[in-house]
Amino acid sequence: METIQSVITEWSDSKSWDHLFQHNFKDSNWSELFDPVNFKFKFGTTPFSQFQILPSVISLYLVIIFSIKFLMRNRKPFSLKYVSILHNAILCIWSLVMCVGILYEVIKRITAEGPLFTVCETVSGFDKGPAYYWSYIFYISKFYELLDTVIIVLKKKPLIFLHVYHHCIVVWLCWYFMYSGWNLQLWVVFLNTFVHVFMYYFYFQTGRGKTVWWKKYITMIQIIQFICLGIAGLLHSAAINLNSSPCFTHYPAFISAYLINFSFLFLFSQFFVKSYSNKPTSSSSTTTPTKTKKID
C-alpha cells in the first residue's frame, strides 16, 4: 500500500512536474549521440530529452496525419513505391543494428557481473553506459517511425486505431524509460528490435511486390513479445522483494509500462483474432501488398 500511495502522490503532486518544463531544445549536447562508452542520459541536455518535445511532436503527428487523410479523401492515392521500400529497408537495418548492439553490450555485462542486473539494476549502474545508449538510440528511432503513418495516409491504406495509438504512446514511453532509468527497458529494446527486424523486412518485401507467406507470424511474435515483457516484470518484482542487494526501480514507470503492455497485448490479440480467425487456410498463406495493414 505504501508503494501505491507513493506513486499516486508523485503523479498528483504538481511540484513534481514543474522541472519538466525548465529546459530548452537549444541546450542539447549533440556529441552525446556519438559517445556510447560514456553515455549517460542527462535530462535537459541529452538531445530529445526535453519533455516539451513529446506533446509537440505527438500533437504535430496527429494534426499532419488527419489533415492528410482529410485532404486525400477525394484524391487518388500516391504510389510511393520506392519511398516505402527505402523507408522499410532503413528501419529493418536500423532495428538489426540496435538489436545486435544491445545484445552484445548486455552479454558483455552478464559475462562480467552476472545476469541479475537485467531485472535488478543498482543505483550505480542504471541509465548509463553502452547498453543504455542503445536504449536511447531506440527512443530516437521512434520519431523516425512516425513516418510510417504519413506513408500510409498518402497511399490511402487502412489506418487503424492500434497503429496510431501504438506510435503515439511508444514515443512517450521510451522517453519515460530513459527519464526514470527503469532497467527493464533493456528487455523492451531487445525484444522490440528483434520483432521489428522481421516486421520491416516483411514490409520491404511486400513493397517490392513479393509474396510473403509468414505474415500472420509477425503478429504472433509481437504478442509473444508482450507476454515475455510481462514475465520480465514478474522477475523484476521478485528481485525487488527478495534480493539482498538494493534494486533500483521507479514505480510510476513500472506501473505505466505494464498498463500499456497489457493494452498492447489485448489490442494485438484482438487484431490477430479479427485478421486470421474464420478464414480459409489458403487466404492466410498469401499476402498481397495492397491489402496489408500496418499495425506497428
From Swiss-Prot:
InterPro entries: ELO_CS, ELO_fam. Residues 277-290 have a biased composition (Low complexity). It is a multi-pass membrane protein. It is an enzyme of class 2 (transferase). Keywords: Fatty acid biosynthesis, Fatty acid metabolism, Lipid biosynthesis, Lipid metabolism, Membrane, Transferase, Transmembrane, Transmembrane helix. GO terms for biological process: fatty acid elongation, monounsaturated fatty acid; fatty acid elongation, polyunsaturated fatty acid; fatty acid elongation, saturated fatty acid; sphingolipid biosynthetic process; very long-chain fatty acid biosynthetic process. Residues 277-296 are annotated as: Disordered. Its main location: membrane. GO terms for cellular component: endoplasmic reticulum membrane. It catalyses: a very-long-chain acyl-CoA + malonyl-CoA + H(+) = a very-long-chain 3-oxoacyl-CoA + CO2 + CoA. Its EC number is 2.3.1.199. It is found in: Membrane. The keyword Transferase applies. One of its GO terms (molecular function) is fatty acid elongase activity. Belongs to the ELO family. This is Putative fatty acid elongase DDB_G0272012. It comes from Dictyostelium discoideum. The lineage of its organism: Eukaryota, Amoebozoa, Evosea, Eumycetozoa, Dictyostelia.
